[in-house]
Amino acid sequence: MLLFTFTFQALVLALIIFSFILVLTLPVIFASPKGWENNKSRIWLACRFWFFLVFLIGILDGIFL
């Protein structure tokens, strides 16, 4: 159970840090000329990873806690 608690806390910390990074970088990318066209695949990948973290944390929270 201790390993799960540590893993869960690490995932929540990763979500917080990744969200902070997205809040800082996405407006810069969208404000730059041709930012969307040049970085479209990176933006979608980052959004997919963020949603994956949110759903993974939600599922783990519902199952184990």
Curated annotation (Swiss-Prot):
Example GO biological process: photosynthesis
Short name of one Pfam family: Ycf9
GO CC, alphabetical: chloroplast thylakoid membrane; photosystem II reaction center
Key word Transmembrane helix present: yes
Membrane topology label: Multi-pass membrane protein
Subcellular location, record wording: Plastid, Chloroplast thylakoid membrane
Subunit structure: PSII is composed of 1 copy each of membrane proteins PsbA, PsbB, PsbC, PsbD, PsbE, PsbF, PsbH, PsbI, PsbJ, PsbK, PsbL, PsbM, PsbT, PsbY, PsbZ, Psb30/Ycf12, at least 3 peripheral proteins of the oxygen-evolving complex and a large number of cofactors. It forms dimeric complexes.
Family: Belongs to the PsbZ family.
Role noted for this protein: May control the interaction of photosystem II (PSII) cores with the light-harvesting antenna, regulates electron flow through the 2 photosystem reaction centers. PSII is a light-driven water plastoquinone oxidoreductase, using light energy to abstract electrons from H(2)O, generating a proton gradient subsequently used for ATP formation.
Protein name as annotated: Photosystem II reaction center protein Z
Organism, scientific name: Euglena gracilis
Designated gene of the protein: psbZ
